[in-house]
Each structure stands twice: as structure tokens, then as C-alpha cells.
Amino acid sequence: MYLERLQLANFKNYEELDVDFSNNVNCLVGNNGVGKTNLLDALYYLSFCKSYFNPVDSQNIRLGADFFAIHGHYRLDDKQSAVQQLNNQQPTTNEVTVSCTLQRGQSKKLKYNKKNCTTFAEHIGRIPLVIVTPSDQNLIVGGSEVRRKFIDGIISQVDKSYLRQLLDYQKALEQRNKLLKQFYENRYFEEDSISVWDEQLVRYGEPIVAARKAFLDEFRPLFVKYYQLIHPDAQTTEPPTIGYETQFGEGTPTMAEQLKANYRRDAQLQYTTIGPHKEDLQFGIGEFAAKRFGSQGQQKTFLLALKLAQFEYIYAHLGSKPILLLDDVFDKLDMQRVSQLVLLVGSDRFGQVFITDTQQGRVESIFEQAPEMPHKIFRTENGELRTEN
């Protein structure tokens, strides 16, 4: 799959834009603050119905305007076209259009092939996309919620039933926590009432844990492969690892048993202390935790390997190569790793790629090493794009 044409109106700093892209590598170059990242965010909107950077949709409307509109014209590969036809998601054509619009004071609207989407969740996975940004460093150094969101987001793109289980689990968790707070405030505890929500948590939570374990079994080898491709010496000097921190390992009590055993503690704390919402991933480099002891370069390599493994996992399960967005990823990497990364993502194993950089000369020097690689370079200035090659 690739994006042929993008049209923007009043999106962030873009008043109006109509641009065609290469189906291979697209580089957006320019100073900081001129709109490179904003354009990538528009692509993210078309895949996930939301911004990657700003959760308040209305704040993405250009200053002084009353609406924004994002229109994408995509071309599917033959395999994905056949799959979507089988699922009645599109007409018998390789062309797909996606539109996301927002009028101030109204609800956001999403259209797929000119038909309104009844829920945003039904759209997830139709336009697979992987994004890497400087803020993703929180995946390494941030709290456990960021890492859970990472794996949940990947699985949800390829498994709609998993997404429904997550949503149902979250609803049950909110109700159980609300009940625990009432117990605390009213100084009483009623086991029959809370057991109703225990049953819901177990019903949705156990499949979530099982799916995460199965995902990691498949994901780890992909991650190690890409880490070593970016950093060939890692196999002997700093082998990377991903550990799974769960309350439900082999030989532990069941989720139902643990929920019941923690009634008193949960009532005192007013929230549920047991469940998949408490799980975490442990990232290691050699014998040390990447979060505490990894250098900035090592952490950046770790992050890139996670994201490229995400790309291959989604491709393997959906049969279509996700669009890959690399936003300002060259910082903290030496020129050798930068070259290895660009040559890697520009190879046949990947599909359409968007790269932002402040240094045009840097990306041009890399393409000189691979003149046969199809690519476009765009100069970005104040909400406008100009082709440089």
C-alpha cells in the first residue's frame, strides 16, 4: 500500500496543500517548526482517526480557520485488495480514498471510499502505518503504560477481536474501580457486587494476557534481527532482550483467585491492583536495563528496532506493507547507522517511507550511495512543499 496523493485544508500550519508522493522513499527537509512533522501527523490521522501528537482535535485546526480537512488517495497492492474485497471493505479497485474532517463545535467525521465510518475502531488496520518520533523515546524510559499501549496498538491493528476485548476490559475495570471507591467512602464491602466485575475482568483479561504472550513470542526474533541490522556488532557486544513482566506466569494463581485474594488491598487503595493493566515489558541491552544504563545512541537503536519489527509483524499478518514514518530519527545516531537505516528502509523489504530531516545534504549523500533507489526530496517552508529532485 502507498499514498499517491495528499490534500490538506487548514490542518495545523497548512492552509492548502495538494501533493503527489513517491511510492518508495519521500524525504521532507527544512528547518524546525516549518511543518514537516505536521504533514506526517496528517498521514497518521488517516490511519488512526486521531493525531499522534495532540489529543485535542480542535487544536489541529489552523489558527483563524473553522475546520480542517485531510484527504488521502491510496493504492493497494494486489494481495491487500483481494483481502479487502473479500471482507466487503471496498469496491473491486486498487484505489482507496480516506477523508478526515472536523468542523469547530462538531464531531469529527471519517469517510472510507466516500462512505461514513460508524465507528473509528472499524477503520483501524485498513491503512496500516508505523511511526517513529523523538517522543517515542518514552517507550524506553517512560512508565509501563507507554509500553502496554505499544503492544496493544500493534495487536489491535491485526486483530479486531483483541481491540474489542481491550475496550470491554477497560469498561469493566472502570466500573470495578468506581465500586471500590464507593466501598471506601461508605465504609462497607459487598463481595457479591464486586464479583460481578471480577467475572468480566477475567472474561476479557485472560485472552488479553494470552494474546500478549503469543505476540511477544513472534515479535522478539523480529526485534533482535532489526537491532543487529542497524547495529551489526550488537550480537557479541550488547545483545538486546525483551522481558515480559506479568502477574500470571506459570505456577501462579489464576486471575480470578488473585482478584479475590486482593479484595482488602484493592478496597483500601480504591483501585484494582491485579490484571493486564498492570503488566510491563523489560528492555535490556546486554546485562543491563536499557532504561537506566543505555546510552542515547543505544536507546535510539533499540527504539528503531522495535518499530521496524512492528512493521514486519503487521506486514506478516495483514499482507500489506505499512506506511513507515520516520520523524527526526537521525539525531543521536552516527552517520554509519544513519546510512544503514535509510538503505534498509529503502530496500524491497519495506514499502513507502516518509523521512524528515533538517539537513538536506545528509539525505542527499545517502542517496548518492544508492542512486537506483526511487525517492523524492521535498523542501518544506511555512506550510508549503517544493520538490527538490
What positions do the PLM features span?
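Conserved NTPase motor "head" modules and their coupling/switch loops across ABC/AAA+ ATPases, GTPases
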Residues: 1-31, 45, 85, 188-323, ...
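Conserved lysine of the Walker
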Residues: 36
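Nucleotide-state sensing region of NTPase/ATPase domains
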Residues: 48-140, 144-146, 155-158, 162, ...
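Structural recognition of the conserved hydrophobic beta-strand(s) that form the central parallel beta-sheet
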Residues: 72, 352-359
